[in-house]
């Protein structure tokens, strides 16, 4: 009996998300007379449908109300259908999605979505509406090749500090702006607006051997995406954006897991185009550098100054990288305790890949997986290990989902 192949098959079934294995899922009984092995796979069925109505609070969205329906077995055919409505103090999300993960009874996924989102956080507001279509193929046991065609129409508005600070952009001074002290408020705040359409196609390759898509204990995930925007596709911006990500989950003991994630990306423009300001990289928050508020890790020079548009809006990076390290303790049932440290940064074009300049955070996290959610509730306390004068030394976050 090929035990490695058998266990791989069991974990692959678990990765579908319809079945949840127990901690010791396999029980073997050997029948020497008949030369047979009876195998019992222990676990329980996972709900296929999610219906949510409620209200809540997260650091990113503020107070919000939501209604959501999602099923991974639409009309009993194994299709995925979802509709989600969420409105809050700082963000709104409206999405409609459908996909067939086994189109024509083959390992082929076909899907489409339409969406409208807006977010008002940190120093910017962004409103996005668009649609996308997906075509994917299974290459091997854990490999997938997919293509995403996307259209996005974006309007954005960025704060500009017009007076009261060193480096006043209204006085013709456009080098990096010195960040204000935390206790000083801008005397006159204006805004700069940007809008544009992005049409893109993104081929991607992924490898995913994790034993559970929502709460993995072992396995790895690798993805390589290459987004082509503009050119013959149209739109207002011409660029290529490769992005790479790798995650690893290693069980250390029966109740502990070491988890590692590294990722990065970079823009390359062509046809004398430019990077849309609303797509430039910004880090911070529970999905990147925990302990620093959402979207506030922007490129800075050696003196801690931001890079600005000619009008005075702060610019994100044309490249980024991040590393996340976790040691997870399962306390019992759906509860996990996590120790973490995060590293990473964003860089402006003139800085290149300055790996000697990076941000560091560390902290603790409590995760609780409830039956009505497919992703864990997270209570995160992070410490900014090298804060700038305009930053807090720590941050508490509440969210739903995972960092990687």
Where are these regions (language model features)?
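Periplasmic polypeptide-binding modules associated with outer-membrane biogenesis and secretion
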Residues: 1-57, 68, 82-100, 240-245, ...
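C-terminal outer-membrane beta-barrel translocator/porin domains of Gram-negative envelope proteins
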Residues: 15, 35, 50-53, 58, ...
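Repeated loop/turn-to-beta-strand initiation elements of outer-membrane beta-barrel proteins
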Residues: 19-21, 49-51, 62, 74-81, ...
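Solvent-exposed loop/turn segments connecting transmembrane beta-strands
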Residues: 33-34, 57-64, 83-94, 119-126, ...
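Transmembrane beta-strand segments that form the barrel wall of outer-membrane beta-barrel proteins
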Residues: 49-59, 65-88, 110-120, 220-232, ...
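Outer-membrane beta-barrel "beta-signal"
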Residues: 69, 202, 364-370, 375, ...
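Residue-level signature of outer-membrane beta-barrel architecture
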Residues: 71-73, 100-102, 137-139, 207-209, ...
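Transmembrane beta-barrel wall of Gram-negative outer-membrane proteins
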Residues: 94-197, 203
């Amino acid at each position: 009996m090929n035990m490695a192949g058998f266990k791989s098959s069991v974990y692959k079934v678990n990765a579908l998300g319809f079945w949840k294995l127990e901690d010791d899922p396999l029980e073997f009984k050997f029948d020497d007379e008949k030369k047979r092995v009876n195998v019992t796979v222990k676990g329980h069925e996972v709900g296929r449908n999610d219906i949510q109505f409620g209200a809540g609070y997260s650091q990113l969205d503020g107070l919000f109300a939501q209604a959501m329906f999602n099923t991974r077995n639409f009309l009993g055919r194994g299709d995925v259908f979802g509709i989600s409505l969420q409105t809050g103090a700082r963000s709104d999300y409206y999405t409609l999605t459908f996909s067939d993960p086994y189109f024509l009874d083959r390992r082929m996924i076909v899907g489409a979505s339409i969406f409208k989102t807006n977010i008002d956080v940190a120093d910017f507001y962004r409103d996005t509406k668009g649609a996308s279509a997906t075509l994917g193929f299974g290459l091997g046991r854990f490999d997938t090749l997919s293509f995403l065609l996307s259209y996005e129409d974006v309007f954005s508005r960025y704060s500009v500090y017009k007076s009261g600070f060193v480096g006043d952009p209204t006085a013709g001074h456009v080098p990096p702006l010195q960040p204000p002290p935390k206790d000083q408020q801008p005397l006159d705040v204006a805004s700069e607006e940007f809008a544009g359409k992005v049409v893109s196609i993104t081929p991607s390759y992924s490898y995913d051997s994790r034993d559970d898509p929502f709460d993995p204990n072992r396995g790895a995930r690798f993805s390589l995406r290459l987004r082509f925007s503009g050119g013959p596709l149209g739109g207002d911006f011409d660029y290529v954006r490769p992005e790479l990500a790798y995650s690893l989950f290693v069980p250390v003991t029966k109740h502990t897991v070491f988890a590692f994630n590294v990722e990065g990306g970079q823009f390359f423009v062509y046809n004398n185009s430019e990077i849309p300001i609303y797509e430039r990289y910004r880090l911070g928050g529970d999905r990147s550098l925990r302990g620093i508020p959402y979207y506030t890790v922007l490129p800075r020079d050696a003196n801690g100054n931001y890079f600005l548009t000619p009008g005075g809006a702060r610019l994100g990076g044309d490249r980024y990288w991040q590393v996340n390290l976790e040691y997870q303790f399962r306390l019992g049932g759906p509860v996990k305790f996590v120790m973490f440290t995060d590293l990473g940064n964003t860089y402006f074009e003139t800085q290149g890949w300055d790996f000697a300049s990076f941000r560091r955070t560390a902290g603790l996290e409590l995760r609780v997986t409830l039956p009505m959610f497919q992703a864990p509730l997270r209570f995160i306390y992070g410490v900014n290990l090298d804060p700038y004068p305009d930053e807090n030394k720590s941050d508490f976050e509440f969210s739903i989902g995972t960092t990687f």
